[in-house]
A protein has these predicted regions:
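Active-site segment of SDR-like NAD(P)-dependent oxidoreductases
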Residues: 75-76, 114-118, 165-168, 186
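Glycine/proline-rich active-site loop of Rossmann-fold NAD(P)-dependent oxidoreductases
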Residues: 157, 168-178
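N-terminal Rossmann NAD(P)H-binding glycine-rich loop of SDR-like oxidoreductase domains
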Residues: 4-24
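Conserved Rossmann-fold NAD(P)-dependent oxidoreductase catalytic core, especially the SDR/UDP-sugar
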Residues: 91-139
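Catalytic helix-loop patch of NAD(P)-dependent Rossmann-fold dehydrogenases
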Residues: 122-167, 188-191
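N-terminal Rossmann-fold cofactor-binding loop
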Residues: 31-36, 53
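NAD(P)H-binding glycine-rich loop region in Rossmannoid oxidoreductase-like domains
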Residues: 40, 46, 50-91, 99, ...
Length: 195
């Protein structure tokens, strides 16, 4: 049975990844800060590990005995000081990479963001190779782009970077609540006949 560590397991995306992998025969170690949420995830194939991305020793310990890591943990907001994003998103990712290298990890899946492509102009048919060298529209975007660049320094860690867009669903505290709040004020217009 494959053993996988999921960072950010107590967050919106992380909880879904924990559930999906545990239902498909993986032994899951759910890494997160929120003990109450983390313990609610526990079952015969899920063990909660309370830890912090900004603490290298937590990640080193959490990676021990694991085959794979899904690094979904991040400070995910568009507001806040650079130092907060740097500590959590950039150094946290570096610590994950270091721990994966030390543990001889078989695979690291890093959850980044398509917002790294965000620009003040329209863009169509964007390719992976179109990733900018820098993007300072906000500190979240900047931290994700800087974090992606770290992977070049770890060619010995088999990894893949995902950039999912617009995640929503049950438990969402970001996108759907905003849409619903707006709809209460102005309604949701139907385009055409709504199809």
């Amino acid at each position: 049975m494959k053993k996988v560590l999921i960072t950010g397991a107590t967050g919106f995306l992380g909880k879904y990844v924990v559930e999906e992998l545990s239902q498909h025969g993986y032994q899951v170690r759910a890494f997160g800060r929120n003990r109450k949420v983390g313990q609610s995830l526990e079952n015969s194939s899920v063990a909660f590990f309370q830890g912090d991305l900004t603490k290298q020793e937590d990640l080193t310990q959490a990676c021990q005995g694991m085959d794979m890591v899904v690094h979904a943990g991040a400070l995910s907001t568009v507001w806040g000081p650079w130092e907060d994003f740097y500590q959590t998103n950039v150094l946290g990712t570096k610590y994950v990479l270091e721990a994966c290298r030390e543990a001889g990890m078989q695979r690291l899946v890093y959850v980044s963001s398509p917002s790294i492509y965000a620009a003040p102009r329209n863009q169509l048919a964007i390719k992976e190779s179109d990733a900018p060298q820098e993007n300072n529209l906000n500190n979240y975007i900047r931290s994700k782009l800087v974090s992606e660049k770290l992977f070049k320094d770890y060619p010995d860690v088999p990894s893949i970077i995902l950039r999912p867009r617009g995640l929503f669903g049950i438990g969402d505290t970001s996108i759907l609540p905003r849409v619903l709040k707006l709809s209460q004020k102005i309604g949701i217009p139907l385009i055409g006949d709504g199809r």
